[in-house]
Amino acid sequence: MSIITLITDFGNKDHFVAKIKGDIYSNYDKAKVVDISNEVSPFNVMEAAYILENAYKSFPENSVHIIDVDSEKTIEKKHIVMCLDNHFFISADNGILSILSQNINPEKIFEITIQEELDR
């Protein structure tokens, strides 16, 4: 069973976290989605990085960690996938994953380009 974790600055009052989970389950109903935190202070990448760094190692290898903090996709702000310590991290390219990988070299880093393909 795949484990997917979420760290967001969305809070829990609105539909945003439920929409992410619904999208995940609609595409992969066997996934197990775990909220690490949805209460990160808005746009606070340092807080998100701190939470992530202290939580991800508690999950099994090959877990997928989605960090949706300060993540509006624009031409200037790309999204990336990083393989680190046998875990997968998905985030905006806003410094969160750079903070996480200060002491461990990532195995791979990819830019997510799926939106460019969908826009064609």
Which functions belong to the PLM regions below?
Residues 1-5:
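Extreme N-terminal starter segment of soluble prokaryotic enzymes
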Residues 27, 39, 43-48, 54, ...:
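Active-site histidine-anchored catalytic micro-motif
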Residues 32-40:
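A short beta-strand-loop structural module common to alpha/beta enzyme folds
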